[in-house]
Amino acid sequence: MCIRDRPAPVPEFQNEKDIFQVIREGDVFLHHPYMSFDPVVNFVRQAAKDPDVLAIKQTLYRVSGNSPIIAALAQAAENGKQVSVLVELKARFDEENNIVWAKKLEKAGCHVIYGLVGLKTHSKITLVVRREETGIRRYVHLATGNYNDSTAKLYTDCGIFTCDERFGEDATAVFNMLSGYSEPKSWNKLIVAPIWMKDRFLSLIEREAENAKKGLPALIRAKMNSLCDPKIIAGSVSYTHLRAHETELHL
């Protein structure tokens, strides 16, 4: 599919199936702009209206001018749900817009977190806590791209829906950390910057380098917006000298 074409519908979410039921049936991977961003918007919209949803937590870095995400979060708070939103005020070129959105969310009753001192929160996470027959279940959306329905039609990004409890526990820990409640000592599945991510990447690069030295299968495949950390670059270059034909870096 070419970018000039309309984004393809996500097969799992066709036929107007309940979005939570779909996620319970299995994780769903999204690749934008080739796949529609609608399921992401609908995820928040349905959570806002669902009487069994207890809480919604989300990080916002950059949103569209008439954001359906903001509208859904405000509606959720007005419907009596616990809504916590981190609005990053240091998002370059969007500082003023984000202040406006933050005030709108606060007015609707959302608990707004204005980022962490000395850090820029760039992660894109949504956590929905839902009451079900089997107990409380956590639904998570993780993404590389902003919760921006306009740029999602232009930028290449990935996202995933899951209700895997390991991700739910990690997402809860992230929001507790952003809220200042606690700092987790370990993670189930997520790798979180700035404390844990760099060392983890370096250890993974070193592992592949050691495998290459031993003649074992070795591969590094990475996709990123930019690469500027000297140690990561040095490790990657060192590895490519060993097995250049098995390294893929997409910038």
Predicted feature residues:
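N-terminal localization/anchoring segments of enzymes in phospholipid and broader phosphate metabolism
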Residues: R4-I220, D229, V237-S238
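Conserved small/polar residues in nucleotide/adenosyl-binding loops
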Residues: M1-D5, T240-L249
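Short, small/polar-rich loop/turn modules that mediate ligand/substrate recognition or access, typified
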Residues: M224
